[in-house]
Amino acid sequence: TELRNLRANLLALLAPHIALAYRNIGGRQEQVSIAYRASEEGDLYERLCASMDRDIRYGQTQNGPHRDDLDITLNGRNAAQFASEGQQRTTAISMKLAQSSLLTEETGHTPIHLIDDVFGELDPSRRIAFLQSLPADAQSLITTTHLDWLHNAPCPLPAFRLEDGALAPL
């Protein structure tokens, strides 16, 4: 239960940062909410003992904190079922930005942002809003297969291409 309490407390700290990041990127009046869902309550040891034969049969444990999950909703509707790809991607990006924001708030240090190919699933307005949401003092490394967003970036960005294992300016 200690792990679950820590996770629930962390999510409570992250929730306002997630909502703000989503509003900044989404640009709409969509309300995102995230709740922690523990897989099961009760004594984990007892549950593991009771399911040992089944766990061996399946080759994996059926109980434990690895089965916990997040319930994410947009405007009260299950995001996994009803959100568009852009909305789902915006939610995932918002969660990462929220982690960065909370880490900066707690430590006083801005983390490095490693961003892997997020632009293919975002419309142009969300791309620009995402770039504007990155902290100005953060080092951000962005990989992409789409370069069209680079021309609409809010400020000039150095760009490189990786070719035959070597970096070369674009």
Describe every region a protein language model picked out.
Residues 157-160:
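Conserved short hydrophobic beta-strand within the ABC ATPase nucleotide-binding domain
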